Amino acid sequence: VVDAIRASKGSTLFVCSLADMQGETWGLTAREHVEALMDHGTRGLLDYVLVHTPVSLRPDSPATGVFTAVTGADSEHASTADLDDLVLSGRIRPVRVCYQDVQAIQAQGPVVIARNLVDPIHPTWHDPAALRDAFAGVLKLCRSRRR
């Protein structure tokens, strides 16, 4: 895959997960996701990184709070109706991002685009309309960089 990306003339976009479940990416921040990709051969190949944040990122405020109900922090009151077969036992965590992470990612080359991407009905899924709008913005950026 990395060789195909390297051979391509197209721009690349990494869409960071909203939440992760137990496994290889358990507990990773958005920055750590990007660094893992770079460590596996994509260094210098990522043009854009799309991350979810429910609030504007500022130097002193990490984005938190949207996933309280699905992280197990409030599992007594959380609804499982929109989580399909997932069990609320702390096995789902948000992929966190903060201002410093965005700065660190951009220092390595990619442009970071931070948007509220969560599906209001399925809080661990990306909202298709929000993704569409973000992708349209990336396409505009790609065209403007070519000029």
Where are these regions (language model features)?
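C-terminal functional extensions of proteins
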Residues: 27-147
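Generic beta-sheet signal
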Residues: 15-17, 52
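Cofactor-cradling patches in redox/metallo enzymes
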Residues: 21-25
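A short helix->loop->beta-strand "cap" motif at the edges of active sites that frequently abuts
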Residues: 7-12, 110
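Histidine-anchored nucleotide/phosphate-binding helix
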Residues: 1-7
